[in-house]
């Protein structure tokens, strides 16, 4: 049945005899072959770089009991070797479980398509860390000369999601490493993006990790620095506030609600630390527009400054604002 509908395309790729059965997907009937998982090589351009051992062992235990339910997607090279397009984690777990045959769908596609398939699977399963996802987006864009909008359509994401992910690649290597190891979240990393001094960015990232700051606290710290303050200023204000009882409606770590102290200290901190609500609105605008946004003023009156770096970027922003 599979052979009649598929013709010789896939069968020509398979010289060895193997057990097969047919499954249906959006592309029609596809033949599934049972192959030794140790023959399947990892795709060198796979976006995902790390596999948690504990997670693999849990999947291996499930595979021992139920088998590999979803076939791996792979391609056979001209030299007879097999390369995984999607399903490397399943393959690793199957080997760990001791299986000598797993279901594999054979497909031939170009490099860009293979990357897109692997990326979509990983993103849908939330397997990639934020930096792996950003690098994969960039790689596919470079290969296909795609715009943010075109890539967003291919992987089923909002354009702003793609833009915000790619901005993480501008962070210093040390901060990217923290992001890869999930020591920093994507929210923490986005808060650091407005710091233009790379060494300061690294120092703030280390402070955020050491003191286990929330994303909101990290945003407040960066806001303090962008207002002309120092990391020492922020740390002092945070320690002062944490040591005092919170005011009604405030919190022990809300540095925008500082307890009474000397007038000079209050005036300095007032000038350096923005209202948390303003910072939150600023962050939301950044995520929606995909570019740096700065709000000067307060909740009653002020000015919004939107940064762009080219005519194309200006036209894109104009289109977004006009649509709303």
Curated annotation (Swiss-Prot):
Pfam families, alphabetized: HTH_ParB, ParB_dimer, ParBc
GO MF, one annotated term: DNA binding
Region (Disordered): 240-266
Coiled coil: none
Keywords on record: Chromosome partition, DNA-binding
Spans through the membrane: none
One annotated Gene Ontology cellular component of this protein: chromosome
Keyword Protein biosynthesis: no
Biased composition (Low complexity): 242-252
One record GO biological process: chromosome segregation
Disulfides per UniProt: none
InterPro entries: Chromosome_partition/occlusion (IPR050336), HTH_ParB/Spo0J (IPR041468), ParB/RepB/Spo0J (IPR004437), ParB/Sulfiredoxin_dom (IPR003115), ParB/Sulfiredoxin_sf (IPR036086), ParB_dimer_C (IPR057240)
Its biological purpose: Involved in chromosome partition. Localize to both poles of the predivisional cell following completion of DNA replication. Binds to the DNA origin of replication.
Family recorded in the similarity comment: Belongs to the ParB family.
Protein name, per record: Probable chromosome-partitioning protein ParB
Organism encoding this protein: Treponema pallidum (strain Nichols)
UniProt gene name: parB
């Amino acid at each position: 049945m599979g052979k009649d509908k598929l013709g010789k395309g896939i069968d020509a790729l398979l010289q060895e005899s193997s057990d097969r059965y047919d499954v249906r997907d959006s592309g029609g009937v596809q033949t599934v072959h049972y192959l030794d998982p140790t023959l399947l090589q990892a795709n060198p351009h796979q976006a995902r770089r790390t596999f948690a051992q504990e997670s693999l062992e849990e999947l291996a235990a499930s595979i021992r009991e139920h088998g590999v339910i979803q076939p791996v997607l792979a391609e056979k090279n001209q030299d007879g070797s097999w390369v995984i397009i999607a399903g490397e984690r399943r393959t690793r777990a199957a080997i760990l479980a001791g299986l000598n045959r797993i279901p594999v769908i054979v497909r031939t596609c170009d490099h860009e398509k293979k990357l897109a398939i692997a990326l979509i699977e990983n993103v849908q399963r939330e397997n990639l860390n934020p930096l792996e996802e950003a690098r994969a987006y960039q790689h596919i864009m470079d290969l296909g000369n795609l715009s943010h909008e075109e890539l967003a359509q291919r992987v089923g994401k909002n354009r702003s999601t793609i833009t915000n992910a790619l901005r993480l690649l501008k962070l210093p290597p040390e901060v990217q490493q923290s992001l890869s190891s999930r020591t920093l979240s994507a929210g923490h990393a986005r808060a650091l993006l407005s710091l233009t001094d790379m060494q300061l960015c690294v120092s703030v990232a280390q402070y955020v990790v050491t003191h286990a700051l929330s994303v909101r606290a990290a945003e407040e710290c960066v806001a303090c620095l962008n207002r002309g303050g120092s990391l020492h200023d922020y740390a002092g204000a945070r320690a002062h506030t944490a040591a005092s009882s919170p005011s009604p409606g405030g919190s022990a770590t809300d540095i925008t609600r500082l307890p009474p102290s000397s007038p000079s200290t209050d005036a300095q901190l007032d000038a350096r630390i923005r209202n948390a609500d303003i910072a939150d609105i600023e962050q939301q605008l950044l995520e929606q527009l995909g570019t740096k946004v700065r709000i000067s003023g307060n909740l009653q009156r002020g000015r919004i400054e939107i940064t762009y770096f080219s005519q194309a970027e200006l036209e894109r922003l104009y289109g977004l604002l006009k649509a709303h």
